[in-house]
């Protein structure tokens, strides 16, 4: 969950709207939800459920309603290498590469990052690498750090500085794109992101659903921002709407169901590093 949400808090928010939404038609209800709930998991759940209901009512696949020109195709998804000592991360990277994952995402802390990336590169010399700096580079020479990681084959860096300190990136010349994650919650943040970042990471639990995520993707493209689509830990049901938005993304990080002990039946398949709709 995002920002301290829980299943119970989300359910309460949704139940409080039942009497308001029941008299509305599905499109009216979906429009109303955008203002009745703040961005977050509750609005995401309700918004996506209403998209699904509308698709059933009109008898069209959801991808058509969402404005896609063709049915969604399989996508290469990142597999996340959890933070650990370099030797453990090297071993995890080697295992992931052996399972067919060609894009790995590393969690970093601002301390020992180069050593960790170097170890992962040794464990998986042929994969693509992206990293999430987790707001940890405020005290570092950001240009030097980005250049060092680029030399190790890193092709993108997420959220190098803390939320609210985005101006630290003003004038920074990075050899690889810098993307906003925590600094980009919804479309209201795009103006700031266009000033300091090269792209954004859209997560439906941040944005508050498919409606806002599609809007963000359109407006990001208009601003010249590169697009990544990520996820919180969730089943294939939670990933499915993000999979539609991800069709237009340069980087896809939808490995949430893999990290669960058990996914729902008829969920996505993960084959050779690709996420494939059932």
Language-model segments: which ranges?
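Metal- or metallocofactor-binding catalytic centers and their adjacent structured scaffolds
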Residues: 1-58
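Metal-dependent enolase-superfamily TIM-barrel catalytic cores that perform enediolate-based chemistry
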Residues: 63-176
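Conserved beta-strand positions in the central sheet of alpha/beta enzyme cores
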Residues: 103-105, 158, 201-203, 228, ...
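Catalytic cores of alpha/beta
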Residues: 139-149, 186-196, 208, 216-217, ...
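A general structural motif
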Residues: 158-162, 178-188, 204-212, 260
């Amino acid at each position: 969950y995002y920002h301290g949400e829980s299943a119970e808090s989300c359910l309460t928010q949704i139940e409080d709207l039942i009497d308001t939404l029941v008299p509305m038609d599905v499109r009216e209800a979906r429009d109303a939800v955008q203002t009745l709930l703040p961005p977050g998991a509750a609005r995401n759940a309700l918004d996506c459920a209403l998209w699904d209901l509308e698709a059933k009512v009109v008898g069209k696949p959801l991808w058509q309603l969402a404005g896609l020109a063709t049915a969604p195709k399989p996508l290469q998804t990142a597999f996340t290498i959890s933070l650990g000592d370099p030797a453990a991360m090297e071993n995890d990277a080697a295992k992931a590469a052996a399972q067919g994952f060609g894009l790995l995402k590393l969690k970093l802390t601002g301390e020992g990052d180069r050593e960790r990336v170097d170890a992962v590169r040794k464990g998986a010399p042929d994969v693509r690498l992206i990293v999430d700096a987790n707001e940890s580079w405020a005290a570092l020479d950001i240009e030097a750090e980005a250049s060092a990681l680029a030399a190790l084959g890193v092709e993108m860096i997420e959220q190098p500085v803390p939320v609210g300190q985005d101006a630290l990136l003003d004038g920074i010349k990075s050899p690889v794109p810098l993307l906003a994650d925590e600094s980009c919650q919804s479309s209201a943040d795009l103006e700031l992101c266009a000033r300091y970042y090269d792209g954004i990471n859209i997560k439906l639990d941040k944005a508050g659903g498919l409606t806002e995520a599609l809007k963000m993707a359109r407006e990001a493209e208009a601003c010249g921002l590169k697009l990544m689509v990520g996820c919180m830990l969730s089943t294939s049901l939670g990933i499915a709407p993000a999979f539609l938005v991800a069709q237009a993304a340069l980087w896809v990080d939808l490995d949430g169901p893999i990290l669960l002990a058990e996914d729902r039946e008829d969920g996505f398949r993960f084959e050779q590093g690709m996420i494939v709709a059932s």
